[in-house]
Amino acid sequence: MHFKFNPLSTKYKSVTGGVKEHSSVRFYVESDEPVTMRMYSEDDYTDRAMKQTEGGFYLDFELSHGLYFYEFFSGGIKYGMGEDYRAVPTNKRWQLTVYPENYSTPDWIKGGIIYQIFPDRFCKAGDFTVGKGKKKREDWGGMPTFRSPDGKVRNNEFFGGNFKGIESKLDYVKELGVDAVYLNPICESYSSHRYDTGDYLKPDSVLGSIEDFKSLTKSGKERDIYFIFDGVFNHTGAGSRYFNKYFDYDEIGAYNDKNSKYFDWYTFWEHPESYASWWGFKTLPTIKKDSKSFQKFVCDKVVEYWVDAGIRGVRLDVVDELTDKFVYKIRKALKARGEDNFLIGEVWEDATNKISYGVRRKYYTDGLLDSVMNYPLRSAIIDYVMKGDCSLLRLTLLEQLNNYPKQSLDSLMNVLSTHDSTRIITLLGRRHTVTDKDLMANEFLDEWEYARGKEREKLATVLQFFLYGVPSVYYGDEEGLEGDLDPYNRRCFNWEKGDKDLTEHYKKIAKIRKGNAVFKDGVMNIIKAEGGLFVFTRGEGEQKITVALNAGRHTKQLYFSKAVKELYSNLTSDKFELKPNGFLIISAKA
């Protein structure tokens, strides 16, 4: 029996990827037998007979926003999604994401580049002082301490990176083609990572004043660089003015008195010592999911304060810990102060069908987020580069092409390293994995490992920069900064001895990305995915750009039917031969 369907081709599904609600989408199936299409919503399904046409059967749908799954029945056989998204006899269904009519994402970030900065470790300008219980480090570039001498993890040492330091390096950041700087938390806090917010309406004094921050955002805007604020709204610090466990603030906190105006924000089982905290960390008391006063404070005060200070986006930390209603309120508040303000969520899985705490999240079916951190793609790129097999990479790309709305796909935050992951050069270069954090401080790549890591990093960044979405470079990756898990992935930027060759590689791929409009929203097609050889295109016609990579162990010969122009490669001869870890970026010859 003949049966053919592929939702990633407009021949079979008139709109690829997510579909706008109430817009018509046509499904077409090649079949020599009558076909019934079954469409599942969250709690029901409908069967509809497809209409016969030349060569097969079709059916038009107009759906309200929501998450749907579908399959076909023909000739007594159930057809579902195969590994390549084509129809095969299986129980696995295709996903259909239907998003709201009024959903859109900011254009300014598409085709752009994000640069992530851990503020304490990027650049220091001038001296600084620290408060009670904090440790001042005078040795810029020294190894961060994991455990204090008493064995406790305090995260209380500061190297002094600050707003003025970042501002002094904006020209360098611009040379990397950067459009947006994502700053890890900058609010007043006890720790150097600042995920334990002390005061949402005050920058940390080590970083500088609010005037210093406004100067930074103003200088950034003059260079078309905009700043993304890290919104930590699931928990506060135990020492915050709102909880005030250590009596550091004059204000009465929830820990101090049940009559505190902040008492409603927190969950106490037995006041004051027994309370809900994030993953059991007593230094991070969690906010009640339904605290209306906290949500109003964030939307009316916090968002306004930082937008007025110059931010153009917010990244929501552990967004799956927040309710969809709260995320909607944050989005509404942020967009009310600028329709093109950018909202990113920290989601580690496919955000279009994410389930957390038993609830299906509606990040895209309700149009809540513009973007998420694309950890699934990170995993797939690393898997490809390390194993020399593109199977997972291909599957991940097909899945995201099918599941995400196009405007979301073009806005995904594509990461390789972050403050929560091992540095990419360390991950790709090392022979062995160290699991004991106390030993990671002594983990450095030897000469051979560094060379391998660097070569692989270049290969990985070609994918990161030229697939759909927006590449996000973690400060220091472009200069070969090493480091395993936290805190070793948060070392100081080396302004004296960085790897200039690697930095030049980043500048080259950034220039290609910024100089070709296809990387903003151009269609992506996989041309060849076989073993270690992966070839894809962006755009169509004369503007089309082809990217070829070889993560395998053997040299691959490439042939082109038309004259081409090489934009960048690491080829070692005039022939189009991709050696292991080779890459080639070409366009049609003018």
Short names for language-model regions:
Residues M1-Y28, D43-Q116, F122-F146:
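The feature marks proteins involved in alpha-glucan
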Residues I117, V173, L183, Y200, ...:
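Conserved, mostly hydrophobic/aromatic
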Residues P34-D44, Y68-Y70, H554-L571:
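Beta-strand-rich binding/interaction modules
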Residues D574-A590:
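C-terminal beta-strand-rich structural cap/linker in extracellular carbohydrate-active enzymes
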Residues F118-D179, I186-A309, I330-R337, N353:
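Substrate-binding/active-site clefts of carbohydrate-active enzymes
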Residues T217-Y226, H235, S240-E251, V302-E304, ...:
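Active-site-proximal helices and loops of the catalytic beta/alpha 8
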Residues D120, G358, N414-L445, T461-D499:
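Aromatic/acidic polysaccharide-binding cleft in carbohydrate-active enzymes
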Residues S14-V19, S23-R26, D32-E33, I526-S561:
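Carbohydrate-binding surface patches
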